[in-house]
Amino acid sequence: MLTTEIINEAVTRALHEDAPEGDITSNHLIPADATAVAELVAREPGVFSGGEVFAAAFKLTDASTAVELKIKDGEPFVAGQLLAVVTGNARAVLTAERIGLNFSQRMCGIATLTAQYVAAIAGTKAKILDTRKTTPGLRPFERHAVVCGGGHNHRYSLSDQVLAKDNHLAVLTRGGKDLTTELKRVRSEIDPAIKFEVEVDRIDQIAPVLAANVDIIMLDNFTLDELRTGVA
């Protein structure tokens, strides 16, 4: 979940990374009392995400900066649309702009691409879910963006759900373990409220996994024909 605390921590870290000793260009070139008005305008159509994060970049640089968001997370926008207006001390605005843009561009990009996938499966019972293959340190932001695009979050971390992947299964089979027996053992050991998912990459793995009464079977790298067979 993307909380204000998570946002402030990540944005503060990013601001320090970008200007550890301050913005020496703006501080020397721009008068201390100069003010500026900046507009965030879309170059391409998309789906918005990260408004609070964008605003935090400016607010954490100078609390007196005013950020007016013209759009909400999850809403679509068109090329040329005004998305936000920033008003404040010119030095502060110039110092924070790249961090604000870095977060908003990445999050809008993920939301926009997710929305395209969601549109592609419209009218079916399928759902678009994300994965743990996120940028280190940015997982809450990227997963929030997926939801903004109409997708759904899968397990958040290794602690949330049992997901036996191909490498887990490989260790078991190489050790001479019976797959169904081992999966049933895990099912009996974990809290019934915890989802139990197993990833398979071959058709012949489906039957022994089904016999273990797991909640979800992930078909990994299947061709379309293999998917049809596996689902049937």
Residue spans for each PLM region:
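Short secondary-structure boundary segments
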Residues: 221
